[in-house]
UniProtKB/Swiss-Prot annotation:
It comes from the Eukaryota. Keywords: Activator, Nucleus, Transcription, Transcription regulation. GO terms for molecular function: transcription coregulator activity. Pfam families: Med22. Its main location: nucleus. Component of the Mediator complex, a coactivator involved in the regulated transcription of nearly all RNA polymerase II-dependent genes. Mediator functions as a bridge to convey information from gene-specific regulatory proteins to the basal RNA polymerase II transcription machinery. Mediator is recruited to promoters by direct interactions with regulatory proteins and serves as a scaffold for the assembly of a functional preinitiation complex with RNA polymerase II and the general transcription factors. This is Mediator of RNA polymerase II transcription subunit 22. It comes from Caenorhabditis briggsae. The keyword Nucleus applies.
Length: 153
């Protein structure tokens, strides 16, 4: 193979790997979103309606009970399906790592880790600033209360 042909093959290989990784990311994002959404809706459905006037008769209560019960069962099944898909994704990732270039993945993982560390650092600074602001406000509020209100026993 000539130099140009090797470069084209390497470029094509990198593009293919990038597409596969993007597909893995999409699958991961979709399955995690499905887990979160269904869990949220199960928790929402588990809330008890305190308004007894909403049901004029016993049939309305039973209808709502069975509707919610079936909805929760379906959502639980969707969570199981998403979990199963995540297990398959893990297997596919292991297979991909065994069969493909480790250097490319290592580079992408290190890049993602550095982005995460940068984001974490920024969020930590933001949290510290907010913590300081809240502490200052609380201190000023306590001083104001102490100066203006006499709390004697």
């Amino acid at each position: 193979m000539s130099g140009n042909a090797q470069k084209k093959a390497a470029s094509r290989s990198m593009a293919t790997k990038k597409l596969i990784i993007d597909e893995f990311k999409r699958r991961l994002r979709d399955n995690i979103k499905s887990l979160n959404d269904n869990f949220y809706h199960i928790i929402q459905a588990a809330k008890v309606n305190p308004d007894d006037n909403a049901f004029k008769n016993q049939t309305g209560k039973m209808t709502e009970f069975y509707t919610i019960k079936n909805e929760m069962a379906v959502r639980a099944q969707l969570m199981v399906r998403a979990s199963d898909e995540l297990l398959r994704l893990t297997t596919d990732l292991k297979e991909f790592l065994i069969l493909h270039d480790f250097h490319f993945l290592t580079h992408n993982i290190k890049q993602a880790e550095s982005q995460c560390e940068d984001t974490l650092r920024q969020q930590s600074h933001l949290h510290q600033a907010l913590d300081t602001d809240v502490s200052n406000m609380l201190f000023a509020l306590e001083e104001e209360i102490a100066d203006n209100f006499f709390l004697g026993h």
